């Protein structure tokens, strides 16, 4: 099967619709849509749910950009892309709940293809999902990783362990020497064994996100919380901001190549705080988080 960008685009548009409808049904609030065009080619649909019953902010973004040539920053490490037109498309989302006992979640699936006459296209898929709890619950982490493992199973026994490790390695905040959360799946440059298999895997990851996340939301949404939990949640959200602005390749690439800033920064939490030399009280649930987010085999 030859790479079919149009087929991928239709799936991504449906995936954005499905995820937004599912999150709206859980929350009770609706997304607002902001459609945009990119002068250099392409555009997208940014959707945001704000101040909902459960989600303080949820952003679900679809983008499809194209051009006659790749920027020099992208071809420096990939000389085979020089002189090719390209298309890049994907769905990216981040959900920031209000209740500190519900973790923040992030998911992304994407496709890239570069073509020139008389040559085979260069293409690959990427994506994944990861979870960032503020208070650790083992059953939530096990469910998240079991869902990830089960969706990987049809594609090979080594797929889950490989992409789990990649996720743990990627979502590491080097300047803090700590994980961003408990990980999940992360893959990139996927183009073997063939287009159909890779596309099927990307679809499984995209659809698997809500199956992994929503049972956790349902389990935690009625838990009572107060000022202490909220203060800790806002402090830990600072780590999310630090990772995205300092280390995340997608954020940096988007900002450095003239991407749409509002859509790129849609992943930012609406409220966040920093505190100099914060130390949680010994033996407290807040202190337990640093141990909980250590890399381990959850399933």
Swiss-Prot record:
EC numbers on record: 1.3.3.3
Cofactor(s) recorded in Swiss-Prot or TrEMBL: a divalent metal cation
Keyword Oxidoreductase: yes
Single GO biological process annotation from the record: protoporphyrinogen IX biosynthetic process
Region of interest: Important for dimerization: 240-275
Enzyme class: oxidoreductase
A GO molecular function held by the record: metal ion binding
HAMAP family assigned: Coprogen_oxidas
Quaternary structure and partners: Homodimer.
Protein name: Oxygen-dependent coproporphyrinogen-III oxidase
Organism of provenance: Salmonella arizonae (strain ATCC BAA-731 / CDC346-86 / RSK2980)
Lineage: Bacteria, Pseudomonadati, Pseudomonadota, Gammaproteobacteria, Enterobacterales
């Amino acid at each position: 099967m030859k790479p079919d960008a149009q087929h991928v685009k239709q799936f991504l548009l449906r995936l954005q619709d499905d995820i937004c409808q599912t999150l709206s049904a859980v929350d009770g609030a609706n997304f607002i849509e902001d459609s945009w065009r990119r002068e250099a080619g392409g555009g997208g649909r940014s959707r945001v749910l704000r101040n909902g019953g459960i989600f303080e902010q949820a952003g679900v973004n679809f983008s499809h950009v194209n051009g006659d040539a790749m920027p020099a920053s992208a071809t420096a490490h990939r000389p085979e892309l020089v002189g090719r037109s390209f298309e890049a498309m994907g769905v990216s989302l981040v959900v920031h709940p209000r209740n500190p006992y519900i973790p923040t979640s992030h998911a992304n699936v994407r496709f890239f293809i570069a073509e020139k006459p008389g040559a085979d296209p260069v293409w690959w898929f990427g994506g994944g999902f990861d979870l960032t709890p503020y208070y650790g619950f083992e059953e939530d982490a096990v469910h998240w990783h079991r869902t990830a493992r089960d969706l990987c199973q049809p594609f090979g026994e080594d797929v889950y362990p490989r992409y789990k490790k990649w996720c743990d390695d990627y979502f590491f905040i080097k300047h803090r020497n700590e994980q961003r959360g408990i990980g999940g799946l992360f893959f990139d440059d996927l183009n073997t064994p063939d287009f159909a298999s890779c596309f099927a895997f990307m679809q499984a990851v995209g659809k698997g996100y809500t199956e992994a996340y929503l049972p956790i939301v349902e389990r935690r949404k009625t838990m009572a919380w107060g000022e202490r939990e909220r203060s800790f949640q806002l402090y830990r959200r600072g780590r999310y901001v630090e990772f995205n602005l300092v280390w995340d390749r997608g954020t940096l690439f988007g900002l450095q190549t003239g991407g749409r800033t509002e859509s790129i920064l849609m992943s930012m939490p609406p409220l966040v705080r920093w505190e100099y030399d914060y130390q949680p009280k010994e033996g407290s649930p807040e202190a337990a988080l640093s141990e909980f987010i250590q890399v381990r085999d959850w399933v």
